[in-house]
């Protein structure tokens, strides 16, 4: 009996640690075009200009700078090889329901309280960022990023998950 108790407590502990993990919220991202491709070299410099119109509390610009430094780029205040312009548009909560029915009666006698069929409900957060990267050696490239959670959760955890998706996407634009 003690093995079952041990295994059960292990799974409960694993579940609790997953629930407190900030990246546990499932999310995905899409770009408005094919993306940005920047051939860069180690020790090149970057500057981030961050605009937060929604007045959202965020550390997106600092976390992005840290990730870029970990890639081997260096942050400067002036005369940078890459100027990254970020405009954080907003973070919104979306909720809607849609009736799904298997009844043929639905098509000729619409009754929203009909018991046949099911309701599909979706709840999620989105975060939109407009991005432009200016380079000394190449043309400027721009895109819009829209990150979306798979479901609702704690707002702070959802925001952190969306920001991580956006940061990882921006970092993926740089290749060495």
Question: What are these language model-derived features?
Answer:
Residues 1-19:
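Sec-dependent bacterial lipoprotein signal peptides
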Residues 8, 37, 75, 118-122:
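Residues embedded in well-ordered secondary-structure elements
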Residues 16-73, 91, 175-176:
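A structural "domain/chain start" motif
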Residues 40-42, 78, 123-125:
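Solvent-exposed loop and beta-edge segments used for protein-protein assembly and interaction
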Residues 48-55, 117, 148-157:
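Second-shell loop/turn segments in exported
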Residues 71-83:
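Short acidic low-complexity segments
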Residues 82-152:
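Surface-exposed short loop/turn segments
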Residues 149-176:
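C-terminal partner/receptor-binding element of secreted or periplasmic proteins
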């Amino acid at each position: 009996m003690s093995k079952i108790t041990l295994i059960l407590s292990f799974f409960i502990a694993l579940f609790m640690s997953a629930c407190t993990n900030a990246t546990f919220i499932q999310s995905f991202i899409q770009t408005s075009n094919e993306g940005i491709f920047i051939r860069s070299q180690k020790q090149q410099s970057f500057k981030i200009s961050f605009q937060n119109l929604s007045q959202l509390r965020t550390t997106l610009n600092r976390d992005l700078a840290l990730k870029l430094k970990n890639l081997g780029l260096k942050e400067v205040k002036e005369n940078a090889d890459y100027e990254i312009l970020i405009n954080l548009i907003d973070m919104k909560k979306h909720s809607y329901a849609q009736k799904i029915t298997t009844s043929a009666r639905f098509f000729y006698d619409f009754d929203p309280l009909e018991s046949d069929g099911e309701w599909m409900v979706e709840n999620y957060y989105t975060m939109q960022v407009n991005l432009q990267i200016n380079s000394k050696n190449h043309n400027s490239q721009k895109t819009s990023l829209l990150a979306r959670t798979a479901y609702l959760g704690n707002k702070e955890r959802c925001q952190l998950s969306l920001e991580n998706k956006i940061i990882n996407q921006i970092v993926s634009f740089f290749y060495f």
